[in-house]
Amino acid sequence: SPAEIARALPQIQRAATANGGSSEEFAKIALAAKRNLGLDDFSRVANMATTAGQLGGFEIKDMAKGLPEQLAAAKNAGLTGYSGYASLLALNQAAVSTAGTTDGASNNVVNLLNKINSRDTAADFKKQGIDLDGSLLKAQEKGTNTLEAFGNLVDRVVAKDPRYAALKAKAKSAPESEQKEIYSNMAQIAEGAGIGKVLQDRQALMGFLAYRNQHEKYGQFGSSTTAIANTGDSVGGNMELVSQTASFKSEVLNANRALAMQEALDKVNPLLGSMAEGITGLIRDYPTLAAAMEGGV
């Protein structure tokens, strides 16, 4: 609500300053996190986003643009709470490696999340002899989030193709500059093999490949993001660095000058107000005075 955002404004401004972003960007993240996952501790939300942005190539400006739609898709996919938020932040960082651009990564993630609980995906899994809804529900009851459970189910479908397994092994040791091409080749194989039968959307498929084949990195992103939210203050650390820059000190000086000027005007304003009221009264009582004053100006 507007009242909640108003209460969070100091934290929003602090997070924006610490990350070199705008208050509007962080307000969008705060609103989306609250609306979709019920996350009402904005300090924690901001710390997790800041940490994720520091660890990977999907930065705060990208989150402000992509998270509102992604968080809605994450909610529909069954991701919940701060652990679900951490999974989403980590997934974005992994997705950059296969997409090449942050916009592409964001779209791949949205499409993947939308596919997890879609009717057409459930129908495709049924053709493979797998009850998608039932399997995801059982996994959640055991404490496995839906993204992890979905990945395990897709693995069952694609594990039979030796070409995919060979490329998967190659991707683990390949330098980052070669990974995008490898993932593209994997996608071509996957589309013709089992995985293409349950993930027919190309962008969703690329999002999945990023998640599955960058799984170790995804896990590191997620655990680091969660840990710093519980024990650290990434926003505070950034703020410490920002506060030492010349531009920040200049902004503080200008703000202090403006504040001092405002305080001085607050003291003078009552006197100016009384003077204005007196002049207005004279002009009202003696109209010729106004003409004389105007002629003398």
Where are these regions (language model features)?
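All-alpha helical catalytic cores of prenyl diphosphate-utilizing isoprenoid enzymes
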Residues: I60
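Small-residue-rich, membrane-active alpha-helical segments
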Residues: L31, K75-N76, G278, V297
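Alpha-helical architecture feature
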Residues: E4-G53, A64-A72, Y85-V268
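Low-complexity, glycine/alanine-rich, low-charge segments that are largely flexible
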Residues: P270-V297
